[in-house]
A protein has these predicted regions:
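Class I (Rossmann-like) S-adenosyl-L-methionine-dependent methyltransferase catalytic domain
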Residues: 1-54, 62-110, 134, 151-233
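Class I SAM-dependent methyltransferase core
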Residues: 58
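A short acidic, Gly/Pro-enriched loop at the edge of an enzyme's catalytic core
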Residues: 109-120
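A short beta-strand submotif of the Rossmann-like class I SAM-dependent methyltransferase core
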Residues: 123-126
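A short His-aromatic
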Residues: 128-130
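A short glycine-rich, Lys/Arg-flanked "PGG" loop and its adjoining helix->strand segment in the class I
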Residues: 136-148
Length: 233
């Protein structure tokens, strides 16, 4: 397990040090999640408050785009990522914008936060980049750091995705990426039963969607993700 964690850290450090994965704008599904369940922007300085959310954690934050997004709205934002390089990017960005964001290097299976210390957690493209058992342990940690009734947003690659089955199979529905900037990293594709196993007993689903994009010159390649908004039990 320790070796796998070390390999993942090295892999993601390489991705970020070479300039990949440095997104500078929030994912649209997270914007919609915020607007529907946290706060909806009405004017340049006025919001409709949906739920009493003050502290938000970006789980697997990368260079910090979602933590920055929440901090810009006046929320107390934190971000954690396995990559030291990504966290350096994130800290520099927050400093440049004059925002206070608690960015840390850390492991999603052992979150360095007190119980019930967040009102919301968001996780974009993270729990599908680890084996299923790791994703389950991370979900347990998310539930621990969320207050009862706290919000958890999560999106996951689906077994209907066009890249399903590509690469060496490391475990059921889990494959090692064979080429590109994520070469050597793990990609898990979630079946319906696996999404159920991730949330059952921990979270109540508020809404769920499948987002799909058709790619390629003939639009036959289907990029498919599950999108879940849940609340902690």
């Amino acid at each position: 397990m320790a070796q796998a964690e070390s390999d993942a850290k090295k892999g993601w450090d390489k991705v970020y040090s070479e300039g990949f994965m440095t997104m500078w704008y929030p994912n649209e599904d997270i914007i919609r999640f915020c607007s529907r369940l946290i706060r909806k922007r009405l004017t340049h300085d006025r919001y409709e408050i949906k739920r009493p959310v003050e502290r938000v954690l970006d789980l697997g934050c990368g260079n910090g785009r979602h933590a920055i997004y929440f901090a810009r709205q006046g929320l107390k934002a934190a971000g954690i990522d396995v990559s030291e390089q990504a966290i350096e990017w994130a800290k520099d960005w927050a400093l440049l914008e004059g925002l206070e964001v608690d960015f840390r290097v850390g492991d999603i299976e052992h979150l360095p936060y007190e119980d019930h210390s967040f009102d919301a957690v968001v996780s974009h493209g993270v729990l599908d980049h680890v084996p299923m058992q790791t994703a389950k342990r991370a979900a347990e940690e998310v539930q621990r750091v969320l207050r009862p009734g706290g919000l958890f947003y999560c999106d996951l690659r689906s077994t209907e995705d066009f890249e399903y089955g590509i690469g060496e199979e490391a475990a059921p529905n889990t494959f090692v990426v064979g080429e590109g900037y994520e070469k050597g990293l793990v990609q898990h594709f979630f079946s319906p039963n696996e999404t159920k196993a991730l949330f059952d007993g921990r979270f109540r689903i508020l809404y769920s969607e499948i987002t799909e994009n058709r790619l390629g010159p003939d639009f036959r390649q289907k990029y498919s993700r599950w999108v879940f908004a849940t609340e902690s039990l």
